[in-house]
Amino acid sequence: MQLVERPRLELSGAKLKLVLEDLVARSEEQGGVEAYVEALRIKCAMFQEVLQKEFQLREFRALCAHMSTVRRRIGQYAQAHWFGEMKKRVAALLDEDQDTDERIRRFCAAFPDDREHRWARDLAAELLHHAHPERYPLMTRWVWDARTNTGVLRELWHGDDVDGMTIDVPDSYTTFLVLREELAQYLSSNGVFRDVLLYVDVLMAQVYAGYIGERGGTYLRADFTTPEDPMLHTRRILGLDGIDQDGRSRLKAADGRAEVVE
C-alpha cells in the first residue's frame, strides 16, 4: 500500500478564535450552534435513507435542493431523460472498492470540463459526505479549491499577506481529512466534545459566510443574496434552506423555474 504524505496546514489560531466567537454570537438567538448541528444530522439521515436504496428521481431532486452550489446549475442532469445515467454515475462514486480521489475524478470527468459544470465536484463531495459523514470529510470547492486557490482553507491560513500568495496544497481526500482533524482538535480544546464532526461543518460554513459577506463577488451573490439575518449565509452554504415555507424547492429546473417538492 502506498503511503500518502500528510500536507502541512498552517492554520491561524487567531482567525479560528474570531470565527468561533462570531458563530456562537450570531446563532444565539436561533437556538445556538446546536440547532445547526441537529439540522445537519437530519440532512445526513435524509441522504443516507435515499442513497442506500434504489432511489427515485424525485428523491434525487430533493437531495439536490439541499446542495447550495449544485441546485441552481444542475438543470437538465436532474431531469427524467438524464436520470438513468446519473444513477450509474452516483453508484460508481459510492463504490468503496476504489480510491476516493479517483472516484471523484472519474465522476467529474463524465461532465464537460468547463466553468458551467464545476458544480459536479460539489455534487460528488456532498453525496459522499452526507452518505458517510465520518468516513468522508466535506470536500466541496468552498472548503478548498486548489485550482482557484480559494475556500475555507485560504481564509484560515496563517500569514499577513495571504491574498498575495498561492497555497501549494492539493484538494485531495487527505488534505480534507487533515483539515477536519485540525479543526476538530481546535473545537475539542474549546469545549466541544459531542458531534464534533458536524460542528466542524458549521464552523467551516461560518468561515465562508464571512468571506461572502466581505469579498463575495457576482458569482457568489447569485447564490447568496443580501442576508435577512446574521446566519442566512451559513444556512445556505450548508444547504439547510432547501425548501421554503410554500413547499418550493431551491432546485432550479432547466428553464430556471423552481421545482415543487411533493
What do these predicted ranges mean?
Residues 1-116, 134-144, 148-262:
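An N-terminal alpha-helical hairpin/helix-loop-helix interaction module that forms a charged
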Residues 110-130:
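Helix-hairpin-helix
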